[in-house]
Amino acid sequence: MIHYGNCNKICEKTVMNQRTIKTAIAVTGTGLHSGQPVDLEFHPQPIDTGIVFERSDITGSTPIPASAFLVQDTMMSSNLVFGGTRVGTVEHLLSAIAGLGVDNLLIRVSASEIPIMDGSAAPFVGLLLQAGFCEQDASKKFIRIVRTVRVKVDDKWAELRPYNGFELNFEIDFDHPAIDKNFQHAQLQFSTQNFIERLSSARTFGFLRDIEAMRQNNLALGGSMDNAIVIDESNILNEEGLRFNDEFVRHKILDALGDLYLIGYPILGRFNAYKSGHALNNLLVREILSDHNNFEIVTFDDNVTCPIEYLPLNGITVEG
């Protein structure tokens, strides 16, 4: 018998137990590269099963665990491949899952890529909130960083340091008139509330010249100003402009949060990065997991002793 645990409304109390969603829920979006409709379903999962992807368009497809070791392609997104089956562009969805503290979830998708939605994590957050949450009868596990680990490629680098909480610091370096030099660094002290209010709605961005080149190769066919910030040689082309002055770097933090969740647990540590991307984020996670002296798995008896705030979600609304 599969044991999901006893359900409690998340708005009633904060818990340090594992959680899954209360009810299955589905949505249809557009594939960024294919431009075709993609069906996405979320289903509850038993304790200690983690985040698992499954291709609903392939009969008998092999489930794909959300693991950094299954990332085989980081060209513009994080893409998982297992048993010959691929699920791509997982980082925005994983960021939403991490931001809401979901430990166990089955994600069924009808194509080789997660739908792009509006280019942020906010639509996924709204969908998960609509599904509701179920507290499960098992302690929530965290991975605590106990030794600083840094990876570097050319002038780009990323690191995780010991820290009693979870903090993300990111700096980008774009010499472009539309990307203000004063807004190329951002910091997020992680909590559910900070994630929803300050990070979840930050959209992905791209340069018009790159999008045109990709379309010539039958890529980015679903990309538009409805799901990305588009920049030409001097301006932001979206009529509504930016959602935040520093939306570009906030989105890089959003990406990193999703990439880092492929470590398998919520992180206790300080993430610092300079010009990092999916490849370097993945390399960092693999490097940490390669040596058990870098980390320890811990649990907390209650929310008072846990240094991360998974706040009650009542009263918080998300557009998108």
Curated annotation (Swiss-Prot):
| EC numbers on record | 3.5.1.108
Catalyzed reactions per annotation: a UDP-3-O-[(3R)-3-hydroxyacyl]-N-acetyl-alpha-D-glucosamine + H2O = a UDP-3-O-[(3R)-3-hydroxyacyl]-alpha-D-glucosamine + acetate
Report any Pfam family annotated for this entry: LpxC
Q: Please name the GO terms that the record assigns under molecular function.
A: metal ion binding; UDP-3-O-acyl-N-acetylglucosamine deacetylase activity
Co-factor requirement: Zn(2+)
Give the record's GO biological process terms: lipid A biosynthetic process
Q: Which UniProt keywords apply?
A: Hydrolase, Lipid A biosynthesis, Lipid biosynthesis, Lipid metabolism, Metal-binding, Zinc
Q: Could you confirm whether the keyword Chaperone appears in this record?
A: no
Q: Where is the active site?
A: H278 (proton donor)
Its annotated function is as follows: Catalyzes the hydrolysis of UDP-3-O-myristoyl-N-acetylglucosamine to form UDP-3-O-myristoylglucosamine and acetate, the committed step in lipid A biosynthesis.
> What family is this protein classified in?
Belongs to the LpxC family.
Listed HAMAP family: LpxC
Protein name, as recorded:
UDP-3-O-acyl-N-acetylglucosamine deacetylase
Q: Which organism is it from?
A: Psychrobacter cryohalolentis (strain ATCC BAA-1226 / DSM 17306 / VKM B-2378 / K5)
Q: Write the lineage as a comma-separated list.
A: Bacteria, Pseudomonadati, Pseudomonadota, Gammaproteobacteria, Moraxellales
